[in-house]
Amino acid sequence: MSDRFELYLTCPKGLESLLAEEAKGLGLDEVREHTSAIRGAADMETAYRLCVWSRLANRVLLVLKRFSMKNADDLYDGVHAVDWADHLAADGTLAVEFSGHGSGIDNTHFGALKVKDAIVDKLRNREGLRPSVEKIDPDVRVHLRLDRGEAILSLDLSGHSLHQRGYRLQQGAAPLKENLAAAVLIRAGWPRIAAEGGALADPMCGVGTFLVEAAMIAADIAPNLKRERWGFSAWLGHVPALWRKVHDEAQARAQAGLAKPPLWIRGYEADPRLIQPGRNNVERAGLGDWVKIYQGEVSTFEPRPDQNQKGLVISNPPYGERLGDEASLLYLYQNLGERLRQACMGWEAAVFTGAPQLGKRMGIRSHKQYAFWNGALPCKLLLFKVQPDQFVTGERREAQPEGTEARQQVPQASEPARLSEGAQMFANRLQKNLKQLGKWARREQIDCYRLYDADMPEYALAVDLYQDWVHVQEYAAPRSVDPDKAQARLLDALAAIPQALGISPQRVVLKRRERQSGTRQYERQATEGRFQEVNEGGVKLLVNLTDYLDTGLFLDHRPMRMRIQREAAGKRFLNLFCYTATATVHAAKGGARSTTSVDLSKTYLDWARRNLALNGYSERNRLEQSDVMAWLEGNRDSYDLIFIDPPTFSNSKRMEGVFDVQRDHVQLLDLAMARLAPGGVLYFSNNFRKFQLDEHLMARYVVEEISAQTLDPDFARNNRIHRAWRLQLR
């Protein structure tokens, strides 16, 4: 075999230039960058050195052959031409990985089989024995990449991906791969800071990946020094003496690095469940003297190195994937910025984020940004110098002390945001509305009400108070509105709400209200299962602000529910499309003789059952899971008081066809009126803004529109929120 080889090193997308620089420093020549990879030339010693020392590569591939191919036969022939007896024992084990397509190979599994067959046939014809396939831990792992008609056949020297250092056996919900963490540290300037004796702190350290990688860089520890099994361990071209030389050198450097006084490297994590796994990872890496992990909130983050030295604050905040996370993340970033300005003057900071727009809310200018990919997610690394001339004042933020409570998941900001002019106007409007509506709500003993409903066109939000929680719904912006401007106004509003209302940011829940199709409006959006009890008209109701688009309580129908309570005494009450049966609870409170509630959703009927039980009602209250139209066609009972509040549009696997309130309301009302007892009343309401009641109904029944009577002061600004009618038999 030649003394020089072509090597192909793979890496996460975005790390190519960093890997090229690192590989050159380790001896790779003629380096060229490709997408998610680099290639170059080196001897065997350098190949070993790259395996043990590369902090950034995924794999080190030794190229055996390049050949052109037009079809599957060319693939077989090209692989078969290699003298495989130089690489693999005839009775050994192998695994084959195939990537790319073209030249008649459109299935990677088929391509891998052709490569395997060529290797097996070559060895069997020569030795009379054949190797077997072992996917997990083979003697030799062969890789073939097909790129625009050229096949690149390689041996994988690394074995398992090099990002698997062996110390992180326990990880959190959103782990950062070790080589990506190392790349972020390098871009953030940690090698320079460490060489100067600086400190490092991570205020949201998870299980400590940044901390361990930082300590290995500072202590000159090869990232894969402890790896025992390599892709070259059973390769017949392996040179053990040369490998021992490279490994012994790395071992000596690690011992020398660990003999130095350790740098101050600390991590803080709010989730107590991650503390011990993080500490276990540190111990497995042999860095217990260098790295310490403590439980701590971002709101109390204050690094205090032993020698008062400055250093690097590095963090990978949560990205936010659940409904309502955006508000929490905004406050988290604001709080992180505040702690940096208050407790880390003179430090450098690096924030790795999948939501770079939130970095603008930290109150510090980012002097440099780098693009990365975390898997398929585009991310940015924001670099900061924590010094006064980089602080953003005026329209964004300015430090002002304010005592506030600490929070478990998204800490309360220790100082308020300096609001933009528009956000301050929004805050002023909230306070004005609170003053006016608050008096009414207290007088009426109402816990939950709408405080703001797109009063200012540029802030297209609905803001509802649920006791000391705020439920914010963002209306989808028209296509003519610049998405970046809409996002900026949303973030401004979210910054203003806690200040204007004097509440903890943790108690702000954000959702986006868009045009819903089918049953999407009823689908579960998260799984927190957090229910809270609220009061309305003497009844107790359960709401859930996080898990669904709606909360379980339609605030605009409050007057209708109160009307039902007043009129229900001694009546047989029927609630169709009952949702969580809040109107049924009011009817029971008002003394209804019996209640029947019908809905297709088991989830909401379970919720309804809990609402009834919460108020002590059970035996005389029937809950029916059924398609309302089908149920009405099969029911023959009579009712004195009926309430119908259907969705605008609905479909389900459990129902026949699709319900459309405009198209189907005549049939619905005719079926329901057939169940109305003489002298009874039916209330019909819906939220379809373009709805028109069929005029033929007015000829058949006594119909009175009562929409204006069903709006409380909190919805008086939006008299199109719903329409309602009172129907009786003629």
UniProtKB/Swiss-Prot annotation:
Keywords: Cytoplasm, Methyltransferase, RNA-binding, rRNA processing, S-adenosyl-L-methionine, Transferase
GO terms under cellular component: cytoplasm
Domain of life: Bacteria
Top-rank EC class of the record's enzyme: transferase
Protein name in the entry: Ribosomal RNA large subunit methyltransferase K/L
Organism expressing this protein natively: Pseudomonas putida (strain ATCC 700007 / DSM 6899 / JCM 31910 / BCRC 17059 / LMG 24140 / F1)
Molecular-function annotations in GO: 23S rRNA (guanine(2445)-N(2))-methyltransferase activity; RNA binding; rRNA (guanine-N7-)-methyltransferase activity
Family: Belongs to the methyltransferase superfamily. RlmKL family.
Subcellular location as annotated: Cytoplasm
CDD domains: AdoMet_MTases, THUMP_AdoMetMT
Chemical reaction(s) catalysed: guanosine(2445) in 23S rRNA + S-adenosyl-L-methionine = N(2)-methylguanosine(2445) in 23S rRNA + S-adenosyl-L-homocysteine + H(+); guanosine(2069) in 23S rRNA + S-adenosyl-L-methionine = N(2)-methylguanosine(2069) in 23S rRNA + S-adenosyl-L-homocysteine + H(+)
Biological role stated in the UniProt entry: Specifically methylates the guanine in position 2445 (m2G2445) and the guanine in position 2069 (m7G2069) of 23S rRNA.
InterPro entries named among the record's database cross-references: 23SrRNA_methyltr_KL, DNA_methylase_N6_adenine_CS, RlmKL-like_Mtase, RlmL_1st, SAM-dep_methyl-trfase, SAM-dependent_MTases_sf, THUMP_dom
HAMAP family: 23SrRNA_methyltr_KL
UniProt EC number: 2.1.1.173, 2.1.1.264
Start and end residues of each THUMP domain: 46-157
